[in-house]
Amino acid sequence: RNVTGVQTCALPIYNFIKNLSLDLKGNTLVLFSRVETHGAILYEKINNNKGEDRKVFFIHGGVDTEERELVREITEKENSAIIVASYGTFSTGINIKNLHNVIFASPSKSRIRNLQSIGRVLRKGKDKVKATLYDISDDCATKSKRNYTLNHFIERIKIYNEENFNYEIVTIQLKNDGNRR
């Protein structure tokens, strides 16, 4: 582990997610599992590299309901907002019609959680013609540890097959050489 407590293997993945979220067109929801070790890091990386006119929000269990509702209302009127949110706060019960992309930034194998999370981007919007899910997984296994991220990804692929989702698996070789931006 490095000084901030982030696994070295995770650094290029965080940078990839940062770059992906900043490059996507439309409003994007980045879902994470753990506030301190995932969400706060992703939010900081994205927010520190965004354009001046781009809105980036950080939502987790410590954010009150009124602020979450305000973020939802703002996002409905935006074209390029990024919401970095915990699964617990934004995977269910949030209705944002003007949401174009969802990024699964943390592993989960829960069928209900995954389908509910995908449902966030499937809401029909006024000018929305496409909804895209980016399901991020890594293969950072070590000899002494199982790679739960990859195992959970395999479980999600089974769900996508059962639900007849169209998907493409893209392998990207990441380098641990810092930030693109």
Residue ranges of predicted features:
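Conserved strand-helix element at the start of the C-terminal RecA-like helicase core
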Residues: 10, 14, 18-45, 160
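Long, largely alpha-helical accessory region at the distal end of helicase-like NTP-driven motors
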Residues: 13, 27, 165-181
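Residues at the starts of beta-strands that form the adenosine-phosphate
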Residues: 27, 55, 129-132
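Conserved beta-strand scaffold positions in the cores of enzyme catalytic domains, especially
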Residues: 56-58, 133, 167-169
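Conserved helicase motor "Helicase C" RecA-like lobe of SF1/SF2 P-loop NTPases
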Residues: 29-63, 67-70
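Short, high-confidence coil segments that cap the C-terminus of an alpha-helix
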Residues: 25-26, 53-54, 79-80, 99
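Single conserved hydrophobic/aromatic residue that forms the stacking wall/gate
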Residues: 2-5, 9
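Conserved RecA-like P-loop NTPase helicase motor core
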Residues: 60-163
